[in-house]
Protein backbone atom coordinates (compact mmCIF):
# COMPACT_ATOMS: atom_id res chain seq x y z
CA UNK A 1 0.00 0.00 0.00
CA UNK A 2 1.08 3.60 -0.59
CA UNK A 3 0.85 5.89 2.46
CA UNK A 4 -1.82 8.52 2.03
CA UNK A 5 -3.61 6.66 -0.75
CA UNK A 6 -6.59 4.33 -0.67
CA UNK A 7 -6.35 0.70 -1.70
CA UNK A 8 -8.73 1.40 -4.58
CA UNK A 9 -6.17 3.84 -6.02
CA UNK A 10 -3.63 1.03 -6.34
CA UNK A 11 -5.69 -2.13 -6.84
CA UNK A 12 -8.41 -2.98 -9.33
CA UNK A 13 -11.85 -3.08 -7.74
CA UNK A 14 -13.83 -6.30 -8.45
CA UNK A 15 -16.87 -5.87 -10.67
CA UNK A 16 -20.09 -4.80 -9.02
CA UNK A 17 -18.49 -2.45 -6.50
CA UNK A 18 -17.94 1.31 -6.68
CA UNK A 19 -14.85 3.17 -5.51
CA UNK A 20 -16.98 4.70 -2.77
CA UNK A 21 -17.93 1.25 -1.48
CA UNK A 22 -14.35 0.01 -1.70
CA UNK A 23 -13.02 3.01 0.23
CA UNK A 24 -15.72 2.56 2.86
CA UNK A 25 -14.76 -1.11 3.19
CA UNK A 26 -11.10 -0.19 3.69
CA UNK A 27 -12.02 2.31 6.39
CA UNK A 28 -14.16 -0.35 8.09
CA UNK A 29 -11.33 -2.89 7.89
CA UNK A 30 -9.08 -0.48 9.75
CA UNK A 31 -11.76 0.18 12.35
CA UNK A 32 -12.38 -3.55 12.89
CA UNK A 33 -8.65 -4.19 13.27
CA UNK A 34 -8.45 -1.42 15.86
CA UNK A 35 -11.41 -2.77 17.80
CA UNK A 36 -9.95 -6.26 17.75
CA UNK A 37 -6.76 -5.03 19.42
CA UNK A 38 -8.74 -3.14 22.06
CA UNK A 39 -11.01 -6.13 22.82
CA UNK A 40 -8.47 -8.93 22.69
CA UNK A 41 -8.62 -9.44 26.45
CA UNK A 42 -12.41 -9.71 26.44
CA UNK A 43 -12.60 -12.77 24.10
CA UNK A 44 -15.51 -11.19 22.27
CA UNK A 45 -16.29 -12.80 18.86
CA UNK A 46 -14.81 -10.57 16.22
CA UNK A 47 -15.94 -9.25 12.88
CA UNK A 48 -14.24 -9.09 9.51
CA UNK A 49 -14.63 -6.85 6.46
CA UNK A 50 -13.98 -8.34 3.02
CA UNK A 51 -12.74 -5.56 0.75
CA UNK A 52 -14.30 -4.11 -1.36
CA UNK A 53 -17.66 -5.06 0.24
CA UNK A 54 -18.42 -2.47 2.97
CA UNK A 55 -20.01 -4.89 5.45
CA UNK A 56 -18.97 -6.66 8.63
CA UNK A 57 -19.33 -10.45 8.95
CA UNK A 58 -19.17 -11.52 12.57
CA UNK A 59 -18.83 -14.43 14.97
CA UNK A 60 -19.96 -17.92 13.98
CA UNK A 61 -21.26 -16.68 10.64
CA UNK A 62 -17.83 -15.24 9.84
CA UNK A 63 -16.23 -18.55 10.81
CA UNK A 64 -18.56 -20.51 8.52
CA UNK A 65 -18.00 -18.03 5.68
CA UNK A 66 -14.23 -18.36 6.03
CA UNK A 67 -14.51 -22.15 6.23
CA UNK A 68 -16.36 -22.15 2.90
CA UNK A 69 -13.73 -19.94 1.29
CA UNK A 70 -14.97 -16.42 1.97
CA UNK A 71 -15.44 -14.32 -1.19
CA UNK A 72 -13.92 -17.20 -3.22
CA UNK A 73 -16.76 -19.51 -2.16
CA UNK A 74 -20.08 -20.00 -3.96
CA UNK A 75 -21.54 -17.28 -1.72
CA UNK A 76 -19.24 -14.58 -3.17
CA UNK A 77 -19.28 -11.15 -1.40
CA UNK A 78 -21.24 -10.00 1.67
CA UNK A 79 -24.26 -7.79 0.96
CA UNK A 80 -25.26 -6.91 4.54
CA UNK A 81 -23.99 -6.57 8.05
CA UNK A 82 -25.13 -9.19 10.55
CA UNK A 83 -28.91 -8.99 11.03
CA UNK A 84 -31.14 -10.12 13.89
CA UNK A 85 -33.96 -12.48 12.95
CA UNK A 86 -37.58 -11.75 13.94
CA UNK A 87 -37.53 -14.41 16.69
CA UNK A 88 -34.93 -12.42 18.60
CA UNK A 89 -32.59 -15.43 18.88
CA UNK A 90 -31.04 -16.16 15.52
CA UNK A 91 -28.77 -14.10 13.27
CA UNK A 92 -28.10 -13.97 9.55
CA UNK A 93 -25.80 -12.31 7.05
CA UNK A 94 -26.59 -12.09 3.37
CA UNK A 95 -24.20 -12.67 0.49
CA UNK A 96 -24.47 -12.33 -3.26
CA UNK A 97 -25.60 -15.95 -3.68
CA UNK A 98 -27.54 -16.45 -0.47
CA UNK A 99 -27.51 -16.07 3.31
CA UNK A 100 -25.84 -17.81 6.23
CA UNK A 101 -28.20 -18.33 9.18
CA UNK A 102 -27.10 -18.92 12.76
CA UNK A 103 -29.03 -20.15 15.78
CA UNK A 104 -27.87 -21.32 19.22
CA UNK A 105 -29.32 -24.79 18.56
CA UNK A 106 -28.22 -25.33 14.97
CA UNK A 107 -25.06 -23.29 14.48
CA UNK A 108 -24.22 -21.40 11.28
CA UNK A 109 -25.17 -22.80 7.86
CA UNK A 110 -25.74 -21.38 4.37
CA UNK A 111 -29.20 -21.88 2.82
CA UNK A 112 -29.18 -21.12 -0.90
CA UNK A 113 -30.94 -21.59 -4.23
CA UNK A 114 -33.66 -24.28 -4.29
CA UNK A 115 -33.15 -25.04 -0.60
CA UNK A 116 -33.82 -21.42 0.27
CA UNK A 117 -36.95 -21.39 -1.93
CA UNK A 118 -38.29 -24.55 -0.25
CA UNK A 119 -37.51 -23.15 3.21
CA UNK A 120 -39.22 -19.89 2.27
CA UNK A 121 -42.40 -21.80 1.32
CA UNK A 122 -42.45 -23.18 4.86
CA UNK A 123 -42.03 -19.78 6.54
CA UNK A 124 -38.25 -19.70 7.03
CA UNK A 125 -37.09 -20.11 10.64
CA UNK A 126 -40.54 -19.17 11.98
CA UNK A 127 -42.18 -22.11 10.19
CA UNK A 128 -42.27 -25.82 11.04
CA UNK A 129 -38.75 -26.42 9.73
CA UNK A 130 -37.05 -24.00 12.12
CA UNK A 131 -33.34 -23.28 11.62
CA UNK A 132 -30.84 -25.22 9.49
CA UNK A 133 -28.72 -27.72 11.39
CA UNK A 134 -26.40 -28.81 8.55
CA UNK A 135 -24.91 -27.55 5.32
CA UNK A 136 -25.99 -29.32 2.12
CA UNK A 137 -25.15 -33.05 2.07
CA UNK A 138 -24.74 -35.17 -1.11
CA UNK A 139 -27.31 -37.99 -1.51
CA UNK A 140 -28.08 -40.84 -3.93
CA UNK A 141 -28.41 -40.35 -7.68
CA UNK A 142 -26.86 -36.89 -7.74
CA UNK A 143 -29.21 -35.36 -5.17
CA UNK A 144 -28.59 -33.27 -2.08
CA UNK A 145 -30.27 -32.72 1.27
CA UNK A 146 -30.14 -30.18 4.08
CA UNK A 147 -31.35 -30.83 7.62
CA UNK A 148 -33.44 -28.39 9.65
CA UNK A 149 -34.74 -28.57 13.20
CA UNK A 150 -38.15 -29.84 12.12
CA UNK A 151 -37.55 -31.69 8.84
CA UNK A 152 -35.21 -32.21 5.91
CA UNK A 153 -35.22 -30.62 2.47
CA UNK A 154 -34.25 -32.89 -0.43
CA UNK A 155 -33.12 -31.65 -3.84
CA UNK A 156 -33.07 -33.64 -7.08
CA UNK A 157 -33.42 -32.67 -10.74
CA UNK A 158 -33.58 -28.96 -9.85
CA UNK A 159 -36.48 -29.33 -7.42
CA UNK A 160 -36.36 -29.24 -3.61
CA UNK A 161 -39.07 -30.32 -1.17
CA UNK A 162 -39.47 -30.67 2.59
CA UNK A 163 -40.26 -33.96 4.34
CA UNK A 164 -40.43 -34.69 8.05
CA UNK A 165 -42.09 -36.46 10.95
CA UNK A 166 -43.91 -39.79 10.60
CA UNK A 167 -43.96 -39.54 6.80
CA UNK A 168 -40.18 -39.24 6.70
CA UNK A 169 -39.86 -42.15 9.13
CA UNK A 170 -41.93 -44.33 6.78
CA UNK A 171 -39.89 -43.15 3.78
CA UNK A 172 -36.64 -43.92 5.60
CA UNK A 173 -37.94 -47.40 6.45
CA UNK A 174 -38.14 -48.27 2.74
CA UNK A 175 -34.77 -46.81 1.78
CA UNK A 176 -35.45 -43.05 1.55
CA UNK A 177 -34.28 -41.51 -1.75
CA UNK A 178 -32.36 -44.69 -2.61
CA UNK A 179 -35.46 -46.86 -2.21
CA UNK A 180 -38.40 -47.61 -4.51
CA UNK A 181 -40.18 -44.30 -3.86
CA UNK A 182 -37.30 -42.11 -4.99
CA UNK A 183 -37.21 -38.41 -4.12
CA UNK A 184 -40.14 -36.28 -2.87
CA UNK A 185 -41.95 -34.32 -5.57
CA UNK A 186 -44.02 -32.16 -3.19
CA UNK A 187 -43.63 -30.63 0.23
CA UNK A 188 -45.69 -32.22 3.00
CA UNK A 189 -49.26 -31.22 2.16
CA UNK A 190 -52.55 -31.17 4.06
CA UNK A 191 -55.19 -33.83 3.41
CA UNK A 192 -58.75 -32.78 4.17
CA UNK A 193 -59.79 -36.04 5.80
CA UNK A 194 -58.87 -36.61 9.47
CA UNK A 195 -56.42 -33.70 9.37
CA UNK A 196 -54.10 -35.92 7.38
CA UNK A 197 -50.80 -35.09 5.72
CA UNK A 198 -49.03 -36.51 2.68
CA UNK A 199 -45.97 -36.28 0.46
CA UNK A 200 -45.87 -37.36 -3.16
CA UNK A 201 -42.71 -39.02 -4.45
CA UNK A 202 -41.29 -39.94 -7.84
CA UNK A 203 -42.88 -43.39 -7.61
CA UNK A 204 -45.69 -43.13 -5.07
CA UNK A 205 -47.29 -41.43 -2.08
CA UNK A 206 -47.08 -41.65 1.70
CA UNK A 207 -50.22 -40.44 3.47
CA UNK A 208 -50.59 -40.03 7.23
CA UNK A 209 -53.58 -39.62 9.52
CA UNK A 210 -53.99 -39.93 13.27
CA UNK A 211 -56.29 -42.93 12.75
CA UNK A 212 -54.22 -44.90 10.27
CA UNK A 213 -50.64 -43.74 10.73
CA UNK A 214 -48.36 -43.49 7.69
CA UNK A 215 -49.39 -45.61 4.71
CA UNK A 216 -47.47 -46.20 1.50
CA UNK A 217 -48.86 -46.55 -2.02
CA UNK A 218 -46.75 -46.96 -5.15
CA UNK A 219 -47.32 -45.47 -8.59
CA UNK A 220 -50.05 -47.47 -10.36
CA UNK A 221 -52.04 -48.26 -7.22
CA UNK A 222 -51.71 -44.65 -6.07
CA UNK A 223 -52.87 -43.38 -9.46
CA UNK A 224 -55.96 -45.64 -9.46
CA UNK A 225 -56.80 -44.50 -5.92
CA UNK A 226 -56.36 -40.89 -7.03
CA UNK A 227 -58.85 -41.48 -9.85
CA UNK A 228 -61.47 -42.16 -7.15
CA UNK A 229 -60.70 -38.91 -5.30
CA UNK A 230 -57.87 -40.05 -3.01
CA UNK A 231 -58.67 -39.85 0.71
CA UNK A 232 -61.67 -37.58 0.11
CA UNK A 233 -63.27 -39.98 -2.38
CA UNK A 234 -65.40 -43.06 -1.80
CA UNK A 235 -62.43 -45.29 -1.03
CA UNK A 236 -61.12 -43.19 1.86
CA UNK A 237 -57.68 -43.77 3.34
CA UNK A 238 -55.54 -46.87 2.82
CA UNK A 239 -55.75 -49.25 5.79
CA UNK A 240 -52.20 -50.48 5.34
CA UNK A 241 -49.18 -50.19 3.10
CA UNK A 242 -49.31 -51.53 -0.42
CA UNK A 243 -48.38 -55.21 -0.19
CA UNK A 244 -46.68 -57.68 -2.51
CA UNK A 245 -49.11 -60.47 -3.42
CA UNK A 246 -48.47 -64.14 -2.67
CA UNK A 247 -47.11 -64.76 -6.17
CA UNK A 248 -44.33 -62.24 -5.53
CA UNK A 249 -45.26 -60.22 -8.62
CA UNK A 250 -48.59 -58.47 -8.11
CA UNK A 251 -49.43 -55.83 -5.51
CA UNK A 252 -52.56 -54.89 -3.57
CA UNK A 253 -53.80 -52.38 -0.99
CA UNK A 254 -56.96 -52.28 1.15
CA UNK A 255 -59.02 -49.16 1.86
CA UNK A 256 -61.47 -47.74 4.39
CA UNK A 257 -64.60 -48.45 2.33
CA UNK A 258 -63.84 -52.18 2.25
CA UNK A 259 -62.51 -52.17 -1.31
CA UNK A 260 -59.07 -53.08 -2.59
CA UNK A 261 -56.86 -52.21 -5.54
CA UNK A 262 -54.95 -55.01 -7.26
CA UNK A 263 -52.07 -54.46 -9.66
CA UNK A 264 -50.34 -56.87 -12.01
CA UNK A 265 -47.83 -56.19 -14.83
CA UNK A 266 -49.39 -55.49 -18.24
CA UNK A 267 -52.89 -55.70 -16.73
CA UNK A 268 -52.46 -52.60 -14.55
CA UNK A 269 -54.26 -51.55 -11.35
CA UNK A 270 -58.00 -52.08 -10.83
CA UNK A 271 -60.32 -51.42 -7.90
CA UNK A 272 -62.37 -54.35 -6.59
CA UNK A 273 -65.43 -53.02 -4.68
CA UNK A 274 -66.52 -54.55 -1.36
CA UNK A 275 -69.33 -56.65 -2.88
CA UNK A 276 -67.16 -58.30 -5.52
CA UNK A 277 -64.22 -58.51 -3.11
CA UNK A 278 -66.30 -60.66 -0.74
CA UNK A 279 -66.87 -63.21 -3.52
CA UNK A 280 -63.26 -62.88 -4.72
CA UNK A 281 -62.12 -63.77 -1.18
CA UNK A 282 -64.20 -66.97 -1.18
CA UNK A 283 -62.22 -68.17 -4.17
CA UNK A 284 -58.78 -67.37 -2.74
CA UNK A 285 -58.24 -63.82 -3.98
CA UNK A 286 -55.61 -63.50 -6.73
CA UNK A 287 -54.17 -66.95 -5.89
CA UNK A 288 -57.51 -68.62 -6.67
CA UNK A 289 -59.10 -69.59 -9.94
CA UNK A 290 -59.93 -66.04 -11.04
CA UNK A 291 -56.48 -64.47 -10.88
CA UNK A 292 -56.18 -60.68 -11.04
CA UNK A 293 -58.89 -58.17 -12.02
CA UNK A 294 -58.62 -56.94 -15.59
CA UNK A 295 -61.49 -54.44 -15.85
CA UNK A 296 -63.37 -51.85 -13.87
CA UNK A 297 -66.72 -52.77 -12.31
CA UNK A 298 -69.73 -52.23 -14.55
CA UNK A 299 -73.47 -52.28 -13.93
CA UNK A 300 -75.13 -55.46 -15.18
CA UNK A 301 -78.76 -55.72 -16.29
CA UNK A 302 -80.32 -59.02 -15.22
CA UNK A 303 -83.94 -60.11 -14.96
CA UNK A 304 -83.51 -60.91 -11.29
CA UNK A 305 -82.31 -57.48 -10.23
CA UNK A 306 -81.42 -54.02 -11.47
CA UNK A 307 -78.59 -53.74 -8.94
CA UNK A 308 -76.07 -56.15 -10.37
CA UNK A 309 -72.41 -55.36 -10.92
CA UNK A 310 -69.85 -57.35 -12.82
CA UNK A 311 -66.07 -57.35 -13.02
CA UNK A 312 -63.68 -59.19 -15.30
CA UNK A 313 -60.68 -61.19 -14.09
CA UNK A 314 -57.85 -63.04 -15.81
CA UNK A 315 -59.72 -66.33 -15.79
CA UNK A 316 -63.37 -65.35 -15.62
CA UNK A 317 -65.82 -62.85 -14.23
CA UNK A 318 -67.80 -62.24 -11.05
CA UNK A 319 -71.34 -60.87 -11.11
CA UNK A 320 -72.81 -59.72 -7.79
CA UNK A 321 -76.58 -59.38 -7.34
CA UNK A 322 -77.92 -57.32 -4.44
CA UNK A 323 -81.26 -58.65 -3.14
CA UNK A 324 -81.57 -56.41 -0.13
CA UNK A 325 -80.96 -58.56 2.95
CA UNK A 326 -79.40 -61.35 0.88
CA UNK A 327 -77.28 -61.54 -2.23
CA UNK A 328 -76.49 -63.93 -5.03
CA UNK A 329 -73.41 -64.16 -7.17
CA UNK A 330 -72.55 -65.79 -10.42
CA UNK A 331 -69.17 -66.72 -11.70
CA UNK A 332 -67.93 -67.66 -15.10
CA UNK A 333 -64.58 -69.21 -15.91
CA UNK A 334 -62.84 -68.84 -19.24
Please describe what each predicted stretch is.
Residues 1-334:
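Extended, compositionally biased repeat/scaffold regions that form elongated interaction surfaces
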Amino acid sequence: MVPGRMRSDCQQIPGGFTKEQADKAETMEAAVAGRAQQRAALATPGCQVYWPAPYEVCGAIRDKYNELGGPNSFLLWPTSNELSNPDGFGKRSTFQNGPIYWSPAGGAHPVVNHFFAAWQRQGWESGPLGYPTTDEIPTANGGRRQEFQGAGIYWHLNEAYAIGGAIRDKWNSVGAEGGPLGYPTTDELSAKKNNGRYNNFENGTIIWSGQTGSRLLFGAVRDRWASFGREDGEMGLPLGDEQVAADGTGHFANFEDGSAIYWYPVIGAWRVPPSVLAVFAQFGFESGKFGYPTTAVEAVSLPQSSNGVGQGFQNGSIIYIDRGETYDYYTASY
